[in-house]
UniProtKB/Swiss-Prot annotation:
Its cofactor is [4Fe-4S] cluster. Binds 3 [4Fe-4S] clusters. It catalyses: 1,2,3,5-tetrahydroxybenzene + 1,2,3-trihydroxybenzene = 1,2,3,5-tetrahydroxybenzene + 1,3,5-trihydroxybenzene. Keywords: 4Fe-4S, Iron, Iron-sulfur, Metal-binding, Oxidoreductase. Isomerization of pyrogallol to phloroglucin. The gene is bthL. This is Pyrogallol hydroxytransferase small subunit.
Amino acid sequence: MEQYYMVIDVAKCQDCNNCFMGCMDEHELNEWPGYTASMQRGHRWMNIERRERGTYPRNDINYRPTPCMHCENAPCVAKGNGAVYQREDGIVLIDPEKAKGKKELLDTCPYGVMYWNEEENVAQKCTMCAHLLDDESWAPKMPRCAHNCGSFVYEFLKTTPEAMAKKVEEEGLEVIKPELGTKPRVYYKNLYRFEKNYVTAGILVQGDCFEGAKVVLKSGGKEVASAETNFFGEFKFDALDNGEYTVEIDADGKSYSDTVVIDDKSVDLGFIKL
């Protein structure tokens, strides 16, 4: 049976918050009977998380839109005592009546994407705009967040689990916290920009930026990546796990080697003068 999935490209998000505004416009002051009560002001069912990596001038800033993951093995469903359920199309919904007064539901979500509505006395979260998807007159056939995005961050699709598994493998898609085994239906492209780190530097030879220097990155004595410096004499090895690495540089016969440690932070070696 076909189910709904979402793919979010971290590399394309510019933190414009159009997705958040679309979500708020759809749900704040709007009650959708059978789906959800109105959203409380200030809640972020589509939350844009931010992370800056590295140091100026070779730093970067990345943004990760984070809705409900609509997990196949959803802890909120398993522990919700009927207040949270999963539809056949994969969408996970909180029953707006059965969830009243059950603030403990928030503790069942390992992703922290559930909110407590003080005004309605009920737990709430992203519904994937199920009320729109169920409406045949809704021509876009996608949630408001995806429809509002002008940067093509979101890909929304309805397909079989088998077809989605093939897409995940072919495109190298990832999920948040895979170790939990919740099997989210929200996947990410370029998630490394938010979860992993890089090592970078600039190479100067006789005071000038050196283009074309050979740079090798090793871990445990084995080469894991290689690159050449660009016009500005810079190189960058990204998507690195925590650990110790060796950077070896050959700039027209001039050599350099250094050991760097990635420990939840990107490393900029500055300008290396050869």
